[in-house]
């Protein structure tokens, strides 16, 4: 029994057949991250990153196409969607049209940065710019948590009132 366990452990560590594993098979085209790419020459820079483990990912936004990472700009009038396409090993293409609230994200960051003379970011104010951005994100998260808490407590209170009614 002991040698069989050792053999199973070694086989699970070596994972035979894992060299043929294709990470593009499990890649979710909707699982991308969007962050700002601050640059002095851009109104609002956005950095879209998708799937470093899969080389056949193409991101398209505003008539620009790039593999895995796309640095683009957003301004009013530019579409708020981007397309992610993944080419499978059999040649088939999976396409996902993702929408994102570029306008709200850019408006909030630009307002906060201009309010405190943080735009355009430079070596002198990048720390302050980052702190202001994080504080905005924390404020929005706290507001969301308070709203969810109020919703839950109101539903519990309403459920208790319904039980007491004859």
UniProtKB/Swiss-Prot annotation:
Gene Ontology CC, one term: membrane
UniProt superkingdom: Viruses
Location (main, coarse): host cell
Positions of disulphide bridges: 32-50, 44-106
Residues annotated as glycosylated: 31, 63, 67, 97
Signal sequence segment: 1-19
Lumenal face of the membrane: 20-131
Keyword terms, alphabetized: Disulfide bond, Early protein, Glycoprotein, Host endoplasmic reticulum, Host membrane, Host-virus interaction, Inhibition of host adaptive immune response by virus, Inhibition of host tapasin by virus, Lectin, Mannose-binding, Membrane, Signal, Transmembrane, Transmembrane helix, Viral immunoevasion
Topology feature Cytoplasmic, residues: 153-166
Protein name (Swiss-Prot/TrEMBL): Early E3 18.5 kDa glycoprotein
Species: Human adenovirus B serotype 11 (strain Slobiski) (HAdV-11)
Organism classification: Viruses, Varidnaviria, Bamfordvirae, Preplasmiviricota, Tectiliviricetes
């Amino acid at each position: 029994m002991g040698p069989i366990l050792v053999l199973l452990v070694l086989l699970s560590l070596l994972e035979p057949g894992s060299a043929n594993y294709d990470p593009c098979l499990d890649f979710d085209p909707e699982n991308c991250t969007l962050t700002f790419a601050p640059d002095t020459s851009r109104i609002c820079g956005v950095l879209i990153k998708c799937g470093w483990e899969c080389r056949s990912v193409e991101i398209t936004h505003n008539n620009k196409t790039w593999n895995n990472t796309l640095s683009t700009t957003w301004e009013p009038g530019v579409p708020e969607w981007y397309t992610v396409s993944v080419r499978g090993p059999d040649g088939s293409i999976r396409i996902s049209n993702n929408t994102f609230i570029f306008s709200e994200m850019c408006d909030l960051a630009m307002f906060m940065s201009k309010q405190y003379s943080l735009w355009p970011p430079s070596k002198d104010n990048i720390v302050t710019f980052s702190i202001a951005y994080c504080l905005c994100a924390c404020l929005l998260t706290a507001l969301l948590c308070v709203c969810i808490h109020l919703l839950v407590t109101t539903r519990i209170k309403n459920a208790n009132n319904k039980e007491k009614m004859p």
